[in-house]
């Protein structure tokens, strides 16, 4: 079907104004009806999603997205060969020579257009390796969950999951968790997925004065909230985990959500309390075993860190997400913000755990396509190997602390006599305020500490009005 010029624009406008996904010819303006003469279903929209005309392509992509997972499946069917080739190229990039600057040919215009369309339909950046559909309307996600009898996995993050510069943990989710074959299958088959932004992701730009800049995010955290098919929260998976541990935690949460979906009142409270109290006991036993393996004496059950009076500092919040801290700690230090140390006991256990952490070939390939390169192939190969070793260690630390400190405290919220928030938004607020140390009342996210002096008027903090 060849349609050009103003007709493309007419079709784009018509689609964007809400024509039915399977519109019949009579639904179209006469000029389109004369040329198309048949229904425009998901298969046709999938072809139009890669149209040369940007307006048409965008309208078709948004219509596919509005069709939900069926729209994603239609796009996959229409472009399976190209998607498979791109997927295989990213996997092959894991072993590509360091002198190849674009080992998966992601800059190729046709491939870039294909992947941009896929990301739009999925609702997630870097969707090629996961092919997951994310709802951004919680009510729609819960309706789908009720219809399919599945739990909801609701991700809360800083920033937008479709943007490169969403918060660091969400970027690690896209690179290390969602592409993992076991994680991907579990999320696709057993959950209805949803994400929402808690607040914009704070960004920092370092201008080196010669045209070079470093642009990244700073501070913030993410969590996956597990809801039953009715939208009631039953658990929270805080921050980043190694892939295998993430699967194990989600499998337990899924079983809980399915088991309690038919319960209410005291029966529901008792079932939730039984589960979460059992998890605390299991964490106690795991901690004893981990301590003995590393030659340490068993220690009292840990609690998540607590700030003193006033709003918490960003440097206190940073160690709550170790992998993220590896990226952000040098930048926090540059702003004059001291970063709290990680307890030695976690460091010693992480040294034992780190070599056992398995990263999928998909993740390693994606990392290779994103890695900064100096141009010296031998140095870049050494740096990449060192980066993977360091990443495994920070993943081990993240997994330990998130499960033994933060998740332990969350389990306690559902124990008998405790008061876990019954609605999702109150639970989100409690996690961010009390555990992630990024309370909504602090617009500066702990980055404006009156107790720190840097020789700048107003501490270098400014407020711009966005009209």
Predicted segment positions?
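Ligand-binding pocket scaffold of soluble enzyme catalytic domains
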Residues: 67, 152, 225
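Bacterial N-terminal signal peptides that target proteins for export
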Residues: 1-9
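Thioredoxin-like thiol-disulfide oxidoreductase module
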Residues: 135-147, 173-235, 243, 248-253, ...
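Bacterial N-terminal signal peptides
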Residues: 8-20
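Short active-site neighborhood of thiol/selenol oxidoreductases, capturing the structured segment around
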Residues: 148-165, 193
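Non-globular targeting/processing and membrane-anchoring segments
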Residues: 27-133, 146-147, 247-467
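Short, solvent-exposed loop/turn and secondary-structure capping segments
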Residues: 59-60, 71-76, 142, 156-157, ...
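Boundary at the C-terminal end of the N-terminal hydrophobic targeting segment
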Residues: 21-25
């Amino acid at each position: 079907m060849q349609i050009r010029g103003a007709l493309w624009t007419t079709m784009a406008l018509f689609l964007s104004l809400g024509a039915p996904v399977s519109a019949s010819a009579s639904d179209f303006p006469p000029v389109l009806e004369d040329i198309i003469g048949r229904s425009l279903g998901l298969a046709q929209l999938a072809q139009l999603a890669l149209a040369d005309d940007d307006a048409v392509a965008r309208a078709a992509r948004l219509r596919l997205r509005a069709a939900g997972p069926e729209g994603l499946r239609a796009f996959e069917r229409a472009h399976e060969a190209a998607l498979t080739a791109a997927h295989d190229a990213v996997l092959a990039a894991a072993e590509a020579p360091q002198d190849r600057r674009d080992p998966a040919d992601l800059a190729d215009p046709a491939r870039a257009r294909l992947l941009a369309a896929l990301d739009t339909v999925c609702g997630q950046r870097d969707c090629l390796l996961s092919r997951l559909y994310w709802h951004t309307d919680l009510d729609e996600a819960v309706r789908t969950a009720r219809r399919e009898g599945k739990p909801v996995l609701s991700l809360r993050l800083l920033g937008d999951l479709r943007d490169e510069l969403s918060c660091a943990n969400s970027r690690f989710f896209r690179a290390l968790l969602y592409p993992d074959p076991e994680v991907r299958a579990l999320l696709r088959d057993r959950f209805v997925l949803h994400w929402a932004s808690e607040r914009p992701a704070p960004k920092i730009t370092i201008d080196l004065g010669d045209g070079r800049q470093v642009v990244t995010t700073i501070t913030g955290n993410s969590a996956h909230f597990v809801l039953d098919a009715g939208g009631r929260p039953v658990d929270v998976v805080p921050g980043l985990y190694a892939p295998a541990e993430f699967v194990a935690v989600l499998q337990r949460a899924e079983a809980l959500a399915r088991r309690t979906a038919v319960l209410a009142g005291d029966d529901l409270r008792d079932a939730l309390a039984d589960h979460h109290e059992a998890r605390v006991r299991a964490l106690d036993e795991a901690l004893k075993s981990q301590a003995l393996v590393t030659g340490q004496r068993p220690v009292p059950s840990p609690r998540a860190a607590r700030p003193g009076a006033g709003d918490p500092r960003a440097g206190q919040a940073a160690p709550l997400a170790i992998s993220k801290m590896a990226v952000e700690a040098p930048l926090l230090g540059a702003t004059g913000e001291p970063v709290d140390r990680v307890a030695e006991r976690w460091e010693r256990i992480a040294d034992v755990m780190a070599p056992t952490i398995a990263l999928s070939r998909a993740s390693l390939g994606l990392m290779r396509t994103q890695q900064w390169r100096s141009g010296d192939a031998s140095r870049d190969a050494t740096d990449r190997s060192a980066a993977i070793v360091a990443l495994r260690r920070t993943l081990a630390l993240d997994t330990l602390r998130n499960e033994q400190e933060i998740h332990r405290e969350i389990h306690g919220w559902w124990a008998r006599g405790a008061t876990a928030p019954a609605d999702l938004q109150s639970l989100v607020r409690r996690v961010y305020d009390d555990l992630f140390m990024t309370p909504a009342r602090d617009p500066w996210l702990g980055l404006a500490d009156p107790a720190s002096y840097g020789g700048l008027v107003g501490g270098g903090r400014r407020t711009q009005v966005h009209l």
